[in-house]
């Protein structure tokens, strides 16, 4: 049989082989061991041998131990040479006095498996590993061969001749031996028994193969440590080398195996990595531990590289070699600069081998503030567990009987997924080496099917690898999509040629039903092409409520029937009632009450489809990180083991309509019965802090009820570990793409539209959601909108690193955190609520019925629309802070304003004011014209006599930012959180002692966006908390604001309220204001937009200071508005320039920019004219429109033909308006490149005498001068060597007391905007005695040829260097002719 066949799949895990065995052969190479007939005979013989196993004696055990300590060399031998080599090997070791009876090696292998070397449970059938079974085979073989077991002499091959039974015994034992070695080698590898795998090279660590032992003090050991220890158990050098050869057989089959001679002891072998590096993603400040094993003869030399740069032993980077073959690289404290591709290179005279892995250091910034406090903390000496973003939901359902164990299954959302999501780590599984630059495109992350509601933002993203240049195109239904404001095509280039992966994104700013279809991303290069396809489903606004019915038919076939839900709900309420208030907060999500209860009934049918995991055993003895009832809890880091990309999930079921109606009726009856009693106070939803760090053991133990094993709902509610753990690999998507966007299915348990990081983490400007009342309306009739009571409420900041797409098939359920959150502060009672205020804990008493519990969880009134017309989340009033009823405006009489345009404006304003409450109740949205009027005129631009209080004035100044502005805000925050800050004047200082119960900063109240007029005061206010007390930094447009600023007043109160105030705003104050809070636990930032509008130039009265009653007169008709009798144009407003530039003077050749801002309804069109002639856009003239409505005419470069009178004309249906300015183009300054009037001369000087090197150069503008000696720049003057320059172009280098070291070539360079020129000369320094022997004989110089002309053009003036008068006389003492061309 083949020597390598048993090892070609050395790295395959047991779970893979178990799965393959159902459909194909158990092991691909077994056919090389035995024929099918021989296998059958061997197994029959094995059964008979087992029957004799009871008669085994203790002597055989001694015999096995002797054999094991002697020579395991034949583990790696070809079976046909096994006996011969055993004899030869034993004869080569006469000094070894131990007995070496020749036995087949299954006993030795068995000994190694059952020895204390491996503490793991064998991953194979106990039948195959029972020592009695293998010993029985040996005894049967001995009886067949008639060989005494006490013979000490080694046997020769002819002595081994036995009957056919002996040969069959030998083959059966060899088969078991090979299987045992395969299983033994496969177990420590980083695959888990349930089939989840990592790549053999450069793959991410799989989360399920991290047993709790990894986090103990010995956690830094390699997962292959069993092999290493087994190798160290082998005492003799021959045995060790043989084991290495056995490992060599395990390399991937694309490497050639060297033929093995009879004696493999000293045969040279090229290095091979038998254990490769693994990619990691760790938090900043954690320890990075890379290890690999390499074999080779002679022992290879191992070197480490990071991004091609060799690493050496330093205090920060420790490189070790243990046991000759285990090589480790440890970074004691990792920082973001350590991110990169690490390569280990092993070389010896026979060849070389490499292994590489990616190490990504997640910065300790507040971008991931919601989840960063879940950073994995391992004990000293432990390898930090890789952090990964995950969107999977794993529900572990415990059975009522402790004997039946648990079943783990995953659930898929109701969508239209057809393709599986490829793991982002798949691109790392490629051959090492430098030959990876030529390959066709490969999609490492496919597009995902998406379903959205009309008007939402859609992000389609995929990742592709391939040899550059990659051409990426997008298609919809076969038609190519061009980049436009509606369909933005983004392509992020790879960060290095070593990892040529591009991120391709298609962003649809606002979706309409006609946008639905099949979207295809096509990537091609010179070596091939690839495509990725996904389907986009757009539900129109009027069918939004039924979308849940139409989308959920894909994966329901396994879950059709459900028992009646009331008993389930009773279980849920009882289980919840026993929890602490902080635990209740985790699970009071509007959908969890029903979905958990319904889901726990599905798994009776799904138990037969477990993923290769024994139903009563779980995974590694754990039930998704929660131990069985008779086991101790694992460490928190085990609970938090994350996943990188989950497999596709099974479908979430729908309840039977009859059951649904039953529930509705029951809830309605109980609500009507409870209406006679005082209703429980609705609990407010204060801004929730980010998740605290993982609690210690006692806290986890306290979270577990002390009763019998938890009910299924308890497991379901807390089984998903760290669903929002941070970690972006090389890409950060702007925050506005994860604004709250919900599909709104018809019932509370329908499919939500996005993951927790998208639906419950809206963009930063969203206010806290309004608390909904509990009216007796069937809660199942309202869509799944905002989630007002989710533990990570809407005010939690949304992280800029890449969240899942808008609708991710793998992120279906908002998952409660594993750890309890701190209890929220009590709500501020309003006058109408004061009598009913109660603590959150009183809402969930034992006396509540299941239906009352559900009705308390689910909002009864229709929630506000999740998004506005722009696709952004709508703001609603925070709970506990009811909107103050505004006073009735005193409206001017109709007679006063009839016949003017003010009637239209006033009508619009009245609609806008009184429509706000309707908007919050989900009523029809504003029309396009109303929205434009609101945006252009401002919320406070009513044309009536309006007396307002200051707080109402401030409230009316708030406005919503556009998606483009939000994108800019996200980029600013992302950069700021990763940039150093100025610590001057900071009153908060941190010590080195870590704070107990530390908590990263979080915002209890965020900054708002304001739109004001020039000269008005403005105050940005927010409230921040954290432990220890965070430091606060303010920025404007990314630049830090000094606390000592005269223009801004920065304050911070004891309760954490921070404010930035300016008394009189100017146009320069327009911008984005960011506050960043930082403490040792992390950073977080929040941004408010301030739009400052210029005061109306057409006679608007100046704004009165805040605090005084503000009276505005009705807007008068503008003087240039035309005839008084022109008809009213309803809903149309004539253009009006809010900003216009004045006359400009620009130098010829420079850039000229003219900015203006115009308002009007409908939006005006702008055109530009120069001296009455239209300005056409071309390469030098560009017309741009920015997001904030600023129009720009950009001219680059400006020429004399561009001078003149420019007129900007704004036109819409209501009329037109214009302004003019004059552009004066100044003459271009004359530039002349530098030129040497007098050049440097070769000079000689006696030792100790001063010398001057001088020249003269002219140019316009005056050039800069640079001196060089040989190749060293002379940057500054010293006492001995000084550089001088005057206004007439004279340049001098003065050396006081020249020495031999001053001799050499000197170059002077002159540079200005027009060019650069250089000149070179030589300085020679000779000793004193040369001066007496100088010759006065004139010297002749042969004219130089033209071959030096090229050097002269480059600044080397060779002719000047060899002029007769320039040569010192000591060079011509012995020659009358200087060969200038030979110098």
Curated annotation (Swiss-Prot):
**In which compartments does the protein localize?**
Cytoplasm, Cytoskeleton; Cell junction, Focal adhesion; Cytoplasm, Myofibril, Sarcomere, Z line; Cell projection, Ruffle
Using the record's annotation, list all stretches that form the Ig-like C2-type domain: 271-360, 440-539, 1001-1085, 1135-1226, 1233-1324
Q: Where is this region: Interaction with SORBS2, SPIN90 and SRC?
A: 676-696
Q: Where is this region: Disordered?
A: 1-22, 52-169, 183-238, 609-653, 673-728, 740-846, 1096-1125
Q: Where is this region: Interaction with EPS8?
A: 766-831
Mark out the compositionally biased spans (Polar residues).
191-201, 832-846
GO terms, molecular function: actin binding; cell-cell adhesion mediator activity; muscle alpha-actinin binding
Briefly state the modifications made to the protein after translation.
Phosphorylated predominantly on serines and, to a lesser extent, on tyrosines. Phosphorylation at Ser-1118 by PKB/AKT1 modulates cytoskeletal organization and cell motility.
Write out the entry's keywords from A to Z: Actin-binding, Cell junction, Cell projection, Cytoplasm, Cytoskeleton, Disulfide bond, Immunoglobulin domain, Phosphoprotein, Repeat
Concerning what turns on (or off) its expression, the entry says: Isoform 3 is expressed de novo. Isoform 4 is up-regulated by TGFB1 during myofibroblast differentiation.
Note down the stretches annotated as region Interaction with SORBS2, SPIN90, SRC and PFN1. Answer: 796-831
- Tell me, what's a Pfam family for it? I-set
Major place of localization?
A: cytoplasm
What is one GO cellular-component annotation here? Answer: lamellipodium
Q: Which residues carry this modification: Phosphoserine?
A: 192, 401, 632, 641, 684, 688, 728, 893, 979, 984, 1101, 1104, 1106, 1116, 1118, 1121, 1352
Q: What does this protein do?
A: Cytoskeletal protein required for organization of normal actin cytoskeleton. Roles in establishing cell morphology, motility, cell adhesion and cell-extracellular matrix interactions in a variety of cell types. May function as a scaffolding molecule with the potential to influence both actin polymerization and the assembly of existing actin filaments into higher-order arrays. Binds to proteins that bind to either monomeric or filamentous actin. Localizes at sites where active actin remodeling takes place, such as lamellipodia and membrane ruffles.
Q: How does it assemble?
A: Interacts with EPS8. Interacts with LASP1. Interacts with VASP. Interacts with ACTN. Interacts with SORBS2. Interacts with PFN1. Interacts with LPP. Interacts with SPIN90. Interacts with SRC. Interacts with EZR. Interacts with RAI14.
Tell me its family. Belongs to the myotilin/palladin family.
Name of the protein in its database record: Palladin
- Native organism is Homo sapiens
What's the source species' lineage? Eukaryota, Metazoa, Chordata, Craniata, Vertebrata
The UniProt gene name for this protein comes to PALLD
